């Protein structure tokens, strides 16, 4: 039979005796094996070869026996001496070529089942063998210009070491085998053809400059990107290579760049820039509907039609063609001018004072598959947008028009960007496991120039420098004749022009327009509106151009061109040191000379003039290097006409700049090129340099020992530019580049400053960028992990404050870290996760080298070593913060924090008044009927800042170092709801189970699955099966059920499993003063006695073991003695007690401890009026010092005054029922809390989401699941984690969901916080406020006192049940019972309103106190389901039906609320079905259908 994994699809085959084709039978295998050991009297001759061309004579030797092997020997040779199929002999065993010479081999192919390695090689086929780490290049001999494949030798791709390949390829005598998919198609190599491989000696020649990896349907966090990139170092990749991360398919390589060219394969070194692009991102498109959007374009097309008929359809088509899974939000926005002053009278940098901003949400987190519905909504909203914002209804039939839209230059683009950035305020709020990035796209009809406020521009720049969101601006107008994007503002009475480095700009041009058509760049309204035949045309007639006698003729111009082109050229490969210094000195002299006349470029090299000519042209993207923001430049030309025309054709070419004239670098010296660069700097350019001293020092100190190449000189020149940039006096230079004259010429190096940004490494070097950055729009790039942005040593010393602390690993930690190497990795990963970048480059090396005394440049790392990281140090930056993490050779972790000081100017602005006014625009969400004021300040809301000392101590295992209020990490909430019973549902033999019984069994299995997945350090094998916790099911009212459990305990003494024992009356959030009082209470506290040890008497002390036992018995959130010991150590650190001789920490054993003086019971010594009468005032202050090490005294009394789950001021006064909020009113309050029955209704499990052990670390999440459940309500599962890999969490959730589906259940993700908080978190999230047209609370027909007194919202609950809504969360009012206290393992419930969810999980509704409804789509569930469905090949019908049904739920519900007849009929039905047993929180279960 045919071999399943080794095949020869392209070559001819022979059939064996069994009739199968392409077979290597066992008989031929034995024959081929025998060929390896021929006797001396035998020889093997290969006649012909596969696909080898004949000689020039055209005669073939034994042509009829081509591709055969003849064994020649004695007459009595063995039977094995026969003609076999083609076996390529190993000629290298007899001929030893030079290692630098190519080695010819015959290529085979294997599939993924054999091995996932791209290349499997037989080491015997290579002279001298192969070794791990060697890099080889493979190239086909079939064609001259074939692709080159690079691969690295490792243990897995050597045939002798690859067990799977050895077994599957044992029937073949192959020398090298490639994976068939995709290499066979990409390389276009037929099987069994000849290839050559060559060892690469100098890896720098093949090391890629940049690699772009595309990811989809996975949330690859920034820390995972760093780990992923580190696994790629010292490996080779090729185009379309699928990459694995933690044994999961994660990305695919799409682009590899080397020296400005896109290559097929490359070697990834430590200096290679790895860029991640997402094909499943969250896109927010902000469309500016300014005044120009209703204007005609120069070609007669309305701007908005250009948007909806050209731009958006092309974008959606590109997304669909690439099979991307983006979730898109489209928002229309504009700014209305409410003044009577024409905007044309405003100066540059000025805007009207009286403005009103509008935002209209068209679609909200909709999958781009529904592009047709999106476009329909977009056209409809555009038609009504201007009417809705301009018409103001005064009375019933009276309307007024207020204001008119401003043009884009005076618009609110920065306000819109700030409002969108509010989603980035809390980095832990994004728990979408299917989408990786957030990206903003601003579409404007303007030309890329905007008048803004200086303070707002500065604040926006600061925010953009601290978040990882990208911003693209797309202009619908023609590119202007100035630098773009350009922001103007007025500062100190002067108008400033700046180019920001945190955004990119594109200019959309319809591809259908003719390339020969001329479109004016300047818009002259009077000229556009003038008729062609009008006489006024004569008024603007231009006089005929008079040619002077000095102008050269065309013949003279061509002669001059030929003379310049063919004149002798001095070939100089290197530049001398003195020449370089001379050039540098000349450059400095020119820069210091403020007044100089522009020089004329005479007798310039004609070839160079084709590239560097100064003719006037706009080059917004075509000639700008790719590592920069898009900068359109205007240049002025002295060049002749012929060279100008020649350049017109050159500019349209798609090749890189370096490819325009490949002979320049080889024929022209560096000095001439540098001279050309200097001469091009004639015109006045913006001076961003503080002083020239650093530049001079750097030039003078540059004394290379050997001649430098062009590349090294260029790199050094750029490095000097960067250092000059960072020596600038203006602190805003890190955000933008100030331009004195936007219409003046600027070299690429001058405009390099804005390229030095956090996004610089996202773009490959020396690549010409397109007019429209389709790649960025199709697949947005993630913020690079590394950055070269770093301040100079001088700035670090003068403008930064310095802090330092050490981190010690507690081996009893939540993350199960065992070494400081692992702790250092977690600290780096957490910073990357929260937006930090790794600083790497010459500036960092210089700063480290000048550190005193322990600076060591060689120990700087970009990626963490795999095993030991002793001595390693790494710099990381975010905004104004720089962190240096250093692991010394003793295993101690040292963290140094640099904070940039606030400038005097900023201090002046902030004194006495706010810098920026509050910004609450009018927003109309997707389903809202009118505009309403935003619930969040779009400008003054800032990203959350973190205390990194607390974070590091928390990672090290000291969880008490961080207050509970700050432990607001990643959280996910799931509800398990009834669903249709599938055909393959669970069943028990010979038993007929009802649907409810099947679902109950499914919940039991789900909880058993979670319990079995608990993380265990060491697996304990037991003969007996573990007894797993069970869910307690009930029907009816929850409080009735708990009261029944409490009464059973009072009557029988048998404590229910849900109850907390009477002794467990505290938890870890108790105040120290209250705990000290309890510990010293005679009846219930510790035995405090006077003890003698070694003739020393210790008064009023206790044993460490006694305190551990007491904590284990009395604290509800302490389960083991280890936890009690750790908590006791934290109490000791906070100053509650100490060792009697101050020789030990807190230990579980026979060790004596005594209370500190401020907490000791003074009545033991002398009688005083009260407790803690002499307590120090300082002890009441919380620990707020971020630099305090773990083992220092502090006091957390104030921290426990408020629960993390409750607001500081609760209108319902819920503090009186919270066990963690015991007041200081005395023993009576404590006794009152003890009499209350306490129930904990959920259980926390430390769950291992990586059950297969794929990761290099424990992947742990905390899972909270309900211990009680009413089948008529939703069952809850909550997840919490800090830095666990999202891919493993997604896999665990998928497994849970599959189990639920087999038992008629549905796992639905819902927001952790209640629904009413959404508008204050996400301003663009859709929601609907709905009022019942018939309010049963006030309607005389239904306001029955008997019903409303028993259940105020009975009619509303009946209405919700009719529309298949299930109870999700109860309001906090429900838990305010004096007799019973309810708590959960995840905290106290704090929902203000009762919340319900539809049975399909797509919509959530809140019931307000006044009987109104607040309805919002469950976007996180809809997005997850749509992403999953679009991944299925045949998904069109299912996803369309699902999305339509989800929207229909809202439409039907809103329609019913507005239907008076329907509501009255339904309420009458509800009144007739009323029964006494319907409690407050219960929904009727037996409604008539």
From Swiss-Prot:
All copies of domain DEP, residue ranges: 1082-1157
A Pfam family hit: IML1
Composition bias type Low complexity, residue spans: 18-46
GO aspect biological process, one term: cellular response to oxidative stress
Topology class, membrane: Peripheral membrane protein
Stretches with biased composition (Polar residues): 51-61, 1185-1206
Family classification: Belongs to the IML1 family.
Record's protein name: Vacuolar membrane-associated protein IML1
